[in-house]
A protein has these predicted regions:
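Generic detector of short alpha-helix boundary/capping microenvironments
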Residues: 7-9, 345
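Enrichment for repetitive, rod-forming helical segments
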Residues: 9-11, 235
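Beta-rich carbohydrate-recognition and catalytic domains
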Residues: 27, 46-344, 349-412, 426, ...
Length: 579
């Protein structure tokens, strides 16, 4: 079955392309991109190798990207087509297999439970304490990634952070600048003195920057382009992506491939499952000309080449992607139908076998109300999951990282996600984020940390059974991530549902306890090597526990062959979990 969403523009629809007002250090009114007086450039033809079948067996529709309507779909969120038209056989050769949706499940009597990271008790882990981190002259200050990036660099064996600073005397038109910090543990950070601007940790200035994406491209073969920056700069009505590259993340070179018109708070991410880059572009959509408010939404563009793609990126309704989901949480106080809730931003990254999406969901109020009432706008960070890098599933509408209602707390408002997250630190995932608080009428923006169990987004929980759909694999060693109070047993079935000899429930050695990488073995002594390439099903029998993930590894030590997101200590420098 082929799913297409036809794009249409109703005559009554009037749509605007606007910015995010006072989120950046420069503040000001909502900027508007004026209509262009020159014809749009011809869209590049999508190469045939960018569409087709993904490694996991998902077949992409012939119309790709899927066309969606900025009018009829504006408040419908998304519903992935591949959850209703699953492959007959799912290839699980890449990465740990997470139970964040029903893609892998044929039937179960277990219940899905969502889990949330805990804030580090010593937050914030990075605060504005330098003159060049001050914003203007009124006492506000900014030292946090505005997407930007926090990564672990396995080559240099250190945590690295690129963040936006207020700019101080180095600011251009009251815009932000880019600074660099580093750490040995991801918690305690230093701001080194660098040579770009003597005596400071500034690595990029001179443009009126807003959001920025810094990506350590661990699969890049050209060392001079291993670090990539997609910076939104130019100011109100002039925002463009500026694409820069670097060999070390300190000295940056402009590739002179600016994008077309976009808006602030636009970002970029890499989808390695299809080897494409995605431009996630903010677009405020005015659905009805009589409505004074706009709906915060996103536009989508992809290209296999970051430079060419950057030149062609343009925020326009023909690229409409999604707006808010119909069941988004609303502001507990300001709920006066002013356009909220809306999707403020989306950052995404490959983790194991899926794409993780971090949605900054705006719940209000508008900037003028924030100024009048001396409050901070309420953005909270939600999570979504994708298996194609375009379609997002969001079953859980609770915040992954929530604001604090205590006005004195560092995260009292306007939480924003950070590129690179999560980082894998042992059996934990590190999520970095920016948060804001008020000192009088001045916003203080700093960086925080939240920590989650590895693979810990969702578990199949309770007492019961779970049978997977038909799968194929290339490994031979079976592993699970589980917290088991009772016991867990695993059974291997053939394509017809019959137990494979030597892999029965009775022959499975009992798995107990809490382990993020527990090996499953059978008393028969058999490994799964004899079943490579064959279609099988897996049946789990769980008593009082939580099953987070499973995978079949070619290694007895359990490397999953999946993507390691922002990386971590003792992981492969190519960004893939392998020896």
């Amino acid at each position: 079955m082929r799913h297409k969403f036809l794009y249409s523009i109703a005559i009554v629809a009037a749509c605007s392309l606007t910015g995010c007002g006072s989120d950046s250090p420069s503040g000001g009114e909502e900027p508007v991109v004026p209509p262009t007086t020159t014809p749009d450039p011809e869209e590049p033809t999508t190469p045939d190798d960018l569409v087709g079948t993904i490694y996991n067996g998902i077949k992409l529709p012939a119309q790709w990207p899927i066309l969606r309507s900025a009018t009829s779909d504006i408040r419908k969120g998304m519903s992935p087509f591949y959850l209703t038209t699953r492959p007959t056989t799912v290839n699980i050769a890449v990465g740990r297999q997470l139970f964040v949706d029903n893609f892998l499940i044929e039937n179960t009597t277990l219940s899905r439970k969502f889990h949330y990271p805990e804030y580090y008790s010593g937050n914030p882990i990075l605060s504005p304490d330098k003159d060049w981190e001050k914003t203007g002259t009124k006492g506000a200050a900014f030292a946090a990634p505005f997407s930007d990036g926090v990564w672990y660099d396995e080559q240099d064996q250190k945590f690295k952070m690129w963040y936006m600073a207020g700019g101080g005397s180095y600011s251009t038109n009251s815009g932000g600048i880019t600074c660099y910090a580093e750490s040995t543990d991801g918690i305690s950070w230093t701001k080194p003195s660098l040579s770009i601007v003597s005596g400071t940790n500034i690595v990029d200035k001179g443009l009126q920057r807003d959001a920025s994406t810094v990506w350590i491209d661990k699969q890049e073969t050209n060392a001079s382009k291993r670090y990539k920056m997609f910076q939104v700069a130019g100011g109100a009505g002039k925002w463009k992506y500026i694409y820069k590259t670097s060999a070390n993340g300190i000295q940056w070179r402009d590739n002179n491939t600016p994008s077309q018109a976009v808006t602030d708070r636009s970002t970029v991410y890499k989808n390695p499952f299809r080897d494409v880059w995605t431009w996630s572009m903010r677009h405020n959509v005015r659905v009805n000309s009589s409505d004074p408010y706009t709906v915060r939404a996103r536009d989508y563009y992809e290209n296999s080449d970051p430079a060419t793609g950057n030149q062609n990126a343009k925020a326009e309704l023909s690229k409409f992607w999604f707006g808010p989901w119909p069941n988004e949480q609303k502001h507990p106080t300001y709920n006066n139908n002013d356009g909220a809730p809306g999707i403020y931003n989306l950052d995404a990254i490959a983790y194991e076998s899926i794409m993780l999406g971090f949605f900054s969901v705006w719940q209000g109020p508008e900037n003028d109300v924030c100024s009048k009432d001396n409050v901070i706008k309420r953005n909270q960070i939600m999570v979504g999951y994708s298996r194609d890098g375009f379609s997002w599933q969001r079953d859980d509408m609770n915040p992954l990282m929530a604001v604090s209602d205590n006005r004195a707390d560092w995260n009292n408002g306007n939480l924003q996600s950070v590129v690179g997250a999560p980082l894998i630190v042992g059996d934990k995932l590190y999520f970095y984020l920016s948060g804001r608080r008020l000192e009088g009428t001045n916003e203080i923006t700093s960086t925080g940390l939240a920590i989650l169990r590895r693979d810990g987004f969702a578990s199949m929980s309770g007492t019961g059974e779970l049978t997977t759909v038909g799968i194929r694999f290339t490994g031979e060693n079976f592993f699970v991530n589980a917290k088991v109070n009772g016991e867990l047993r695993v059974e291997i079935l053939d394509a017809n549902g019959n137990v494979v000899s030597g892999f029965s429930k009775a022959e499975c050695k009992v798995v107990k306890g809490d382990n993020c990488k527990a090996k499953v073995e059978w008393t028969s002594g058999k490994t799964l090597s004899s079943l490579k390439g064959q279609k099988i099903k897996v049946k789990f029998y769980l008593t009082d526990g939580d099953l987070y993930a499973f995978w079949i590894s070619p290694e007895s030590t359990g490397e999953s062959q999946g993507y390691t997101a922002g990386g971590g200590p003792n992981l492969n420098k190519l960004g893939i979990d392998k020896k």
